[in-house]
């Protein structure tokens, strides 16, 4: 059995989304180009693909998935701030 690779920032991003009030389901184990996260926030459903940094590219499977996906766009996030922005909110700086 092979396991899906989880980006190092995955847990941090999931925790921040949940703290912001989102429901988060990790889809990382699905493979076949499926985005990493299913996110529900304020009656909206989002898909998020986590990347380790700004330079990381989509895999061919991810590109194929997004090309066939009939729902909303997949958000590419590489940081907590990017994930929070994808929700349409700005994180408060303390």
Residue ranges of model-derived segments:
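Catalytic phosphate/metal-binding cores of nucleic-acid and nucleotide-processing enzymes, i.e., regions
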Residues: 1-94
